[in-house]
Amino acid sequence: AFIWAFTTYFAEGFPYSLIRTISTFFFRASGVSLEATGLTSLLGLAWIFKFLWAPYLDFFGTKRKWLLLTQGILVVIFCLITLSAGRSWALPFVALLFFAASVIASTHDTAIDGYYLEALDQAGQARFVGYRVMAYRIAMMFGSAVIVTLGARNGWPVAFGLSSFLLTLLFFFHLFFLPSCEYEKKPIKALIKKLISVPHLIVLLLGLVLLAAILLMDRSRAFLGSLP
């Protein structure tokens, strides 16, 4: 438990650092205006509103499956960011990728916290409280110090490339060594079928449009107009 308690919470803190902190440095270094860079604060909304979809992780699949699924998606997203980071014309696409990453990473956090509660009894949970916080903080410091420095000195494709590689290592470690500790009530594919049904899809699209209109209507032009 000492090993996976560290790696899972490192894997929780590292994407958060990439999305909430390092993205700001990246966009500023890419020539985006300070006002437009302030839009990166909206990436934190996923962690605020994750309670809306967090219950689905209890009813579909297992926390381990959700953990692996979201980690795998994060690997793909940051590989795409790596390939796009050195191209100024791709900055809107990178911004969209960071938004997608924020939703996936917040879900990933929920899966990790849930797995921790499922895999350990109360005594074990109490024993690792400080330990998992330490792992999370180390990940945050690694991102803020090492990745930012690497991006400034060697270029952001290199920095995000290292980030993608590290996330890939964590994914495969958890895939092969993270123990199973619960039975799923319903498969994840049942949730996917439910979400793509017409009524749910309409509600989802309307919600996204409404959220985008409220939050971005007055500021999206500032972001696009500041691109080099």
Question: What are these language model-derived features?
Answer:
Residues 1-47, 213-226:
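Helix-loop boundary and gating motifs at the non-cytosolic
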Residues 10, 77, 89-108:
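Hydrophobic core of transmembrane alpha-helices in multi-pass small-molecule transporters
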Residues 10, 39-45, 72, 99, ...:
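Transmembrane alpha-helical cores of Major Facilitator Superfamily
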Residues 23, 105-120:
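Intracellular juxtamembrane helix-capping segments at the cytosolic ends
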Residues 48-62, 151:
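Helix-to-loop junctions at the C-terminal end of transmembrane segments
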Residues 68, 72-89:
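C-terminal ends and interior cores of transmembrane alpha-helices
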Residues 85-93, 122-228:
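Intracellular loop-helix junctions on the cytosolic face of multi-pass helical membrane proteins
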